[in-house]
C-alpha cells in the first residue's frame, strides 16, 4: 500500500490501532514533549493533538515512533522487509551488468522501477489552497513545539528543506532543525557537509551577495519524508527515490516565489530566501544525545510566503536521550544499510546501530573472517563507504558465531577475544558530529575500532581458545525427555 499524502497515512494508522487522537487541550510548550516521550518509550501509537493550547491547528507527533510504523509508511509489514529498500539502493549505487540473457530478464523489473522515477508536476495543488504573503506571514500562528525547559525558543523539527545548487540538475531534500526567530524568520541549522549547506555554498560562490531561494515543506507524504533521511545516491533526487519506493511518481508543484518544486500534497509550505549576510546565534537546544548543545551562528531563513491546505495539520517531533523518534528511525533504517554494506563487503553477516548509541555513534558488525587483519579492513570500509557513518565513533567487529544485536554476545566477545592494545584501532583528527561536546575540537575528534574476532595465525602466537559447545546428540535427547523431567 502506498500513501499519496500524510492524511491517507494517518487514516491507515488509525484504522490499524496505530494512532490515537487526543481531544484534551495540550500545550505545545513542554507538555506535548512529555506526553509523546512517555508514549514512545512504551512503544505506543502516533499522536494527533486535536486542540493545542492557543492554536487551532492539530499537531501530529510520534509518527515514526516505532520501527513498525516506519515500515508501514513504506508499505511494508515488518521492519526486516526494509532490506528490500537497501537492496534497491545497493543496485542503484553500483548496478551490475547482466551476466547473460536470463539475468537480464530478471533485472527488467528493477530497471522498470528505475524508469518510474521522475516527479510529476501538478496544477492546483492541495498545498496551495491557502496563500499568505506580506504582513499575513506569521510563523507564531503555527503550533511549533517548545520541547525542553532549557530550549531557547520553539523549534521546527520535521521541516523538509528543499534546495538546489547552481551547477546541479536535481534538487536536494534534507531535514534541518529551525529555530523560531520572529514572525517571518527561522534559523536554518544545517551543518557544512549536509546537502542544503553544500548547495548554499555553491550558490554563494557563483552569485556572491545574492539571496538564495529556499522552501520548507511540513507534513509531506511519509515516503517523501523518509526518502530525505535515506542514503540516496548523490546523482538521484529524493523525489525520484520516493517515487521508486511508492511505485508511482512523486507529485510536485512549483513554488510561488521561485523555481523550486515542492511536494504537492504537503500540509504547509514555507517559501523564502537566505541572505548570505544575515546570520544568527542558534540554540541551545536539547538534542538526540540527551544533552543541550552549544550555540553557534547559522543562516537566517526569511519567510515571504506561507501556503497550506485547508485545515492543515502540523507535523512535529522532539529529540532527546534515546529512545526518541530519530532513534526509532535509526533502528528501522538499520535494515536498509545491511544490503548496501554487503554489496561492497560480502563478508559482512550483519550490521547493527544500537539505539542507545544515539542512532549512529556506535556500530557492531559481524563478519565471516577470512584472513588476519580482516576486521580492521571492515572497520575502515564502514567508516569511509557511506557519509552516514563518518560520525560513527566506535565500531566493534565480531565473528559470525556472535549475534551483533545481542549485547550479551558482544560483551562476551570483547572480553574474551580482545587484547586492549593489540586489538584496538585509534584514529585521530577525524570528522565528528558537531553536537559531540566530548570531542576536543568542534567537529574534529578520534575514532576507536575494536577487533573482537577470533585471532588467526599472524595475529597471535598463542593457542586460541575453543568455545564450549554441548554434544548435539545429548541436546536432542534432553529435548525429548524435557517434559518428563517436570522442570517448568
UniProtKB/Swiss-Prot annotation:
<keyword id="KW-0472">Membrane</keyword>
<keyword id="KW-1003">Cell membrane</keyword>
<feature type="binding site">
    <location>
        <begin position="194"/>
        <end position="195"/>
    </location>
    <ligand>
        <name>prenylated FMN</name>
    </ligand>
</feature>
<keyword id="KW-0288">FMN</keyword>
<dbReference type="InterPro" id="IPR002830">
    <property type="entry name" value="UbiD"/>
</dbReference>
<feature type="binding site">
    <location>
        <position position="238"/>
    </location>
    <ligand>
        <name>Mn(2+)</name>
    </ligand>
</feature>
<keyword id="KW-0456">Lyase</keyword>
<dbReference type="Pfam" id="PF20696">
    <property type="entry name" value="UbiD_C"/>
</dbReference>
<dbReference type="GO" id="GO:0005829">
    <property type="term" value="C:cytosol"/>
</dbReference>
<protein>
    <recommendedName>
        <fullName>3-octaprenyl-4-hydroxybenzoate carboxy-lyase</fullName>
        <ecNumber>4.1.1.98</ecNumber>
    </recommendedName>
</protein>
<dbReference type="Pfam" id="PF20695">
    <property type="entry name" value="UbiD_N"/>
</dbReference>
<dbReference type="GO" id="GO:0005886">
    <property type="term" value="C:plasma membrane"/>
</dbReference>
<comment type="subunit">
    <text>Homohexamer.</text>
</comment>
<dbReference type="InterPro" id="IPR049381">
    <property type="entry name" value="UbiD-like_C"/>
</dbReference>
<keyword id="KW-0831">Ubiquinone biosynthesis</keyword>
<dbReference type="InterPro" id="IPR023677">
    <property type="entry name" value="UbiD_bacteria"/>
</dbReference>
<feature type="binding site">
    <location>
        <position position="172"/>
    </location>
    <ligand>
        <name>Mn(2+)</name>
    </ligand>
</feature>
<dbReference type="GO" id="GO:0046872">
    <property type="term" value="F:metal ion binding"/>
</dbReference>
<keyword id="KW-0285">Flavoprotein</keyword>
<dbReference type="InterPro" id="IPR048304">
    <property type="entry name" value="UbiD_Rift_dom"/>
</dbReference>
<dbReference type="GO" id="GO:0008694">
    <property type="term" value="F:3-octaprenyl-4-hydroxybenzoate carboxy-lyase activity"/>
</dbReference>
<keyword id="KW-0479">Metal-binding</keyword>
<keyword id="KW-0464">Manganese</keyword>
<comment type="pathway">
    <text>Cofactor biosynthesis; ubiquinone biosynthesis.</text>
</comment>
<dbReference type="GO" id="GO:0005737">
    <property type="term" value="C:cytoplasm"/>
</dbReference>
<dbReference type="GO" id="GO:0006744">
    <property type="term" value="P:ubiquinone biosynthetic process"/>
</dbReference>
<feature type="active site" description="Proton donor">
    <location>
        <position position="287"/>
    </location>
</feature>
<dbReference type="InterPro" id="IPR049383">
    <property type="entry name" value="UbiD-like_N"/>
</dbReference>
<dbReference type="Pfam" id="PF01977">
    <property type="entry name" value="UbiD"/>
</dbReference>
<feature type="binding site">
    <location>
        <begin position="175"/>
        <end position="177"/>
    </location>
    <ligand>
        <name>prenylated FMN</name>
    </ligand>
</feature>
<keyword id="KW-0210">Decarboxylase</keyword>
<comment type="function">
    <text>Catalyzes the decarboxylation of 3-octaprenyl-4-hydroxy benzoate to 2-octaprenylphenol, an intermediate step in ubiquinone biosynthesis.</text>
</comment>
<feature type="binding site">
    <location>
        <begin position="189"/>
        <end position="191"/>
    </location>
    <ligand>
        <name>prenylated FMN</name>
    </ligand>
</feature>
<comment type="similarity">
    <text>Belongs to the UbiD family.</text>
</comment>
Amino acid at each position: 500500500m502506498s500513501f499519496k499524502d500524510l492524511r491517507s497515512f494517518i487514516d491507515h494508522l488509525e484504522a490499524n490501532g496505530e494512532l490515537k487522537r487526543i481531544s484534551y487541550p495540550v500545550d505545545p510548550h513542554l507538555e506535548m514533549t512529555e506526553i509523546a516521550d512517555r508514549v514512545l518509550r512504551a512503544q505506543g501509537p502516533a499522536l494527533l493533538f486535536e486542540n493545542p493550547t492557543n492554536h487551532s491547528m492539530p499537531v501530529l507527533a510520534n509518527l515514526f515512533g516505532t520501527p513498525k510504523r516506519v515500515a508501514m509508511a513504506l508499505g511494508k509489514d515488518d521492519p526486516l522487509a526494509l532490506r528490500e529498500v537497501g537492496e534497491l539502493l545497493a543496485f542503484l549505487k553500483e548496478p551490475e551488468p547482466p551476466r547473460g540473457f536470463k539475468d537480464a530478464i530478471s533485472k527488467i523489473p528493477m530497471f522498470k522501477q528505475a524508469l518510474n522515477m521522475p516527479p510529476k508536476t501538478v496544477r492546483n495543488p492541495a498545498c496551495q489552497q491557502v496563500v499568505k504573503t506580506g504582513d499575513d506571514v506569521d510563523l507564531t500562528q503555527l503550533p511549533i513545539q517548545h520541547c525542553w525547559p532549557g530550549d531557547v525558543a520553539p523549534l521546527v523539527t520535521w521541516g523538509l528543506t528543499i534546495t538546489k545548487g547552481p551547477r546541479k540538475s536535481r534538487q536536494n531534500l534534507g531535514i534541518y532543525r529551525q529555530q523560531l526567530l520572529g514572525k517571518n524568520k527561522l534559523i536554518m541549522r544545517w551543518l557544512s557537509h549536509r546537502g542544503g549547506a553544500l548547495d548554499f555554498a555553491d550558490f554563494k560562490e557563483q552569485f556572491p551577495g545574492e539571496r538564495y531561494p529556499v522552501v520548507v515543506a511540513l507534513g509531506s507524504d511519509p515516503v517523501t519524508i523518509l526518502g530525505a533521511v535515506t542514503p540516496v545516491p548523490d546523482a538521484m533526487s529524493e523525489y525520484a527515490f520516493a517515487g521508486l519506493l511508492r511505485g508511482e511518481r512523486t507529485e510536485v508543484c512549483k513554488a510561488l516565489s521561485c523555481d523550486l518544486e515542492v511536494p504537492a500534497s504537503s500540509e504547509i509550505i514555507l517559501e523564502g530566501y537566505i541572505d548570505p549576510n544575515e546570520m544568527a546565534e542558534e540554540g541551545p537546544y536539547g538534542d538526540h544525545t540527551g544533552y543541550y548543545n552549544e550555540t553557534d551562528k547559522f543562516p537566517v531563513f526569511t519567510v515571504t510566503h506561507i501556503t497550506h491546505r485547508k485545515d492543515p495539520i502540523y507535523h512535529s517531533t522532539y529529540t532527546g536521550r534515546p529512545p526518541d523518534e530519530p532513534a526509532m528511525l535509526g533502528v528501522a533504517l538499520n535494515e536498509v544499510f545491511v544490503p548496501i554494506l554487503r554489496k561492497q563487503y560480502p563478508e559482512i553477516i550483519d550490521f547493527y546501530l544500537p539505539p542507545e548509541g544515539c542512532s549512529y555513534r556506535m556500530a557492531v558488525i559481524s563478519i565471516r573472517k577470512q584472513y588476519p587483519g580482516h576486521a580492521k579492513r571492515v572497520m575502515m570500509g564502514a567508516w569511509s563507504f557511506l557519509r552516514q557513518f563518518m560520525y560513527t565513533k566506535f565500531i566493534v567487529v565480531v565473528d559470525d558465531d556472535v549475534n551483533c544485536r545481542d549485547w550479551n554476545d558482544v560483551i562476551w566477545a570483547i572480553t574474551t577475544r580482545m587484547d586492549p592494545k593489540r586489538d584496538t584501532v585509534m584514529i585521530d583528527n577525524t570528522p565528528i558530529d558537531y553536537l559531540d561536546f566530548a570531542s576536543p575540537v568542534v567537529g574534529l575528534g578520534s575514532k576507536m575500532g575494536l577487533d573482537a574476532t577470533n585471532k588467526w595465525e599472524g595475529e597471535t602466537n598463542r593457542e586460541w581458545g575453543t568455545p564450549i559447545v554441548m554434544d548435539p546428540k545429548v541436546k536432542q535427547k534432553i529435548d525429548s525427555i524435557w517434559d518428563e523431567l517436570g522442570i517448568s
